[in-house]
Amino acid sequence: MEGKAYALASGTIINAIATGKGSAFGLDLKVYAKVKLIDDGKNKIEGKVLDNPNIKPNLIVRCVKNTLDYFGLNYSAYVETKTEIPIKSGLSSSSATSNAVVLATFDALGEKIDDELILNLGIKSSFDEKLTVTGAYDDATASYYGGITITDNIERKILKRDKMRDDLNVLILIPNLEKNVDVNRMKLIKDYVEIAFNEAINGNYFKALFLNGILYASALNFPTNIAIDALDAGAITAGLSGTGPSYIAMVEDENVEKVKEKLNRYGKVILTKPNNDGASIY
């Protein structure tokens, strides 16, 4: 029994840590998962992160285990993943990994695809491995469904879904900066993030993304000038993704080179597109 699936990275429109409500959109960078199941009653699960053997496979093993436990099965399994998503950079690599592995396990089992169950098993696995502060329902849903999702992470509810303009390019900057997750500082900006969140609910996604990025970058001591530099070079919007250190900029074709040149001075730049199609078995 074998299953294969992929899920998407996501970029932040509103980080949910301050208010419990967030928004993200799917990016065309993927995690691919392959799961093999053996009906031997031994419940022995092994995993391998192919592109980074130094990373412990705890999350991917946990995703398979939680899925098999849900169906009351004691199969053994082997799971492997490979990724196009930079890890620990604010691009939802763990949400994407969880979604891909759980979906691949469903495929291997021949189970009917239940979107909400797959999302919840992935989130449970991230909580079990202490990889999330809020459950990251915004990231998880954008990674799974593609497009834009606006969510209440506490209630695990989707408040709104929309398509992201896929004629735009997304430039992702991975700067040489340390990650900093100071939850208390992020809670301080709650009332101001609420203003950005209302912009998102009203469909002003680019405005929301920029405001959110400035607020969280300030709270987490990341440079705020990077987003302004991107705008100066012609980006439509730009801001910190997740809790950083990545920044994302939305750019029309004619300004890609100018914005890329500007961002290059701060670190590595990746060019991708929005993805409105979401996760899939392949």
From Swiss-Prot:
Write out the GO cellular component annotations. Answer: cytoplasm
EC number(s)? 2.7.1.71
- What's the main place this protein lives? cytoplasm
What catalytic activity does the UniProt entry give for this protein?
Answer: shikimate + ATP = 3-phosphoshikimate + ADP + H(+)
Q: Does Glycoprotein appear among the keywords? A: no
- One biological process term in Gene Ontology: chorismate biosynthetic process
Superkingdom assignment = Archaea
Q: In which pathway does it act?
A: Metabolic intermediate biosynthesis; chorismate biosynthesis; chorismate from D-erythrose 4-phosphate and phosphoenolpyruvate: step 5/7
Pfam families (UniProt xref): GHMP_kinases_C, GHMP_kinases_N
Gene Ontology terms for molecular function:
ATP binding; shikimate kinase activity
Q: What residues does ATP bind to?
A: P86, I87, K88, S89, G90, L91, S92, S93, S94, S95, A96
Coiled-coil stretches noted in the UniProt entry, renumbered to this chain: none
Question: Which InterPro entries does the entry mention?
Answer: GHMP_kinase_C_dom, GHMP_kinase_C_sf, GHMP_kinase_N_dom, Ribosomal_Su5_D2-typ_SF, Ribsml_uS5_D2-typ_fold_subgr, SK_arc
For this UniProt record, the keywords arranged alphabetically read as follows: Amino-acid biosynthesis, Aromatic amino acid biosynthesis, ATP-binding, Cytoplasm, Kinase, Nucleotide-binding, Transferase
Q: Where in the cell is it found?
A: Cytoplasm
**Keyword Cytoplasm (UniProt):** yes
Q: PANTHER family this protein is in? A: HOMOSERINE/4-DIPHOSPHOCYTIDYL-2-C-METHYL-D-ERYTHRITOL KINASE, SHIKIMATE KINASE
Q: Which family does it belong to?
A: Belongs to the GHMP kinase family. Archaeal shikimate kinase subfamily.
Spell out the protein name for this chain: Shikimate kinase
Q: What is the protein's species of origin? A: Methanocaldococcus jannaschii (strain ATCC 43067 / DSM 2661 / JAL-1 / JCM 10045 / NBRC 100440) (Methanococcus jannaschii)
